Amino acid sequence: MVTSVLSRGTVSRVSSVLNRDVKQFGKQFLFDGREETCWNSDQGSYQWVLMEFPQNVLVSQIHLQFQGGFSCQTCTLEGCQKDGELVKIADFYPEDTNALQKFAFSEQSVSKLRISFLNSTDFFGRITVYHLDVLG
């Protein structure tokens, strides 16, 4: 049975926040479990979310919920051990929908994980994520 590997000790970073308005659209809303909050990236063709775990974790699934029209057609998942260089784990291809989407891949031990959003469905390259979870 897979469970979330996110904890209070998980440190996250994002490529950008819409209009630098972290109080309304900041990274903290990726993980808060509330339906009405979200992370909104600023415009640009390459956006990402980076998570650093306090220790190595086994990961095998990503759960993402976008706002339709502000999703991504191609995502790359990269990970590494502490102080290592990120290496590609998998590519995955979300649908442009509001529904929660689940992506499975071979189990990896990582202390750092990055999801790169390579091409947004939004003309300006913005990404909106209401829910993100990492399971293993």
From Swiss-Prot:
The keyword Membrane does not apply. It comes from Xenopus laevis. The lineage of its organism: Eukaryota, Metazoa, Chordata, Craniata, Vertebrata. Belongs to the NR2C2AP family. This is Nuclear receptor 2C2-associated protein. The gene is nr2c2ap. One of its GO terms (cellular component) is nucleus. It is found in: Nucleus. Keywords: Nucleus. Its main location: nucleus. May act as a repressor of nr2c2-mediated transactivation by suppressing the binding between nr2c2 and its response element in target genes. It comes from the Eukaryota.
